[in-house]
């Protein structure tokens, strides 16, 4: 059974973009235990998404300041969004 500490380690590894295999080693859990635990997989994904959120927030702020490279990157994020037709 995974402890809260294991789950925290898994989420932190996700945030740092470690692979799932590396995450299991760092969190000291078996790959099978990780794969069979929906909460562990959710926490890993959550960590990854939170890190992406932070990066995108930095890109957004720099684009708003007019940094050309960041404007281009931010525009690429916008271009990937599919808006529903009204």
Language-model segments: which ranges?
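Short, amphipathic alpha-helical "recognition" segments used to contact nucleic acids or chromatin
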Residues: 1-18
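Residue-level signal for cytosolic alpha-helical hairpin/rod architecture
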Residues: 7, 41, 56-57
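Residues in the recognition helix of alpha-helical DNA-binding motifs
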Residues: 13, 26, 36-38
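The alpha-helix within a helix-turn-helix
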Residues: 22-24
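Short, solvent-exposed alpha-helical "recognition" segments
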Residues: 35-52, 83-84
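Amphipathic alpha-helical protein-protein interaction segments
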Residues: 52-86
């Amino acid at each position: 059974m995974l402890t809260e500490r294991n789950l925290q380690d898994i989420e932190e590894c996700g945030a740092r973009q470690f692979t799932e295999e590396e995450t299991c080693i760092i969190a000291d859990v078996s790959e099978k235990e990780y794969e069979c635990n929906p909460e562990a997989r959710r926490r890993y994904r959550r960590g990854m998404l939170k890190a992406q959120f932070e990066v995108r927030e930095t890109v957004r702020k720099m684009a708003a300041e007019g940094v050309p490279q960041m404007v281009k990157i931010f525009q690429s994020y916008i271009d990937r969004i599919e808006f529903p037709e009204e």
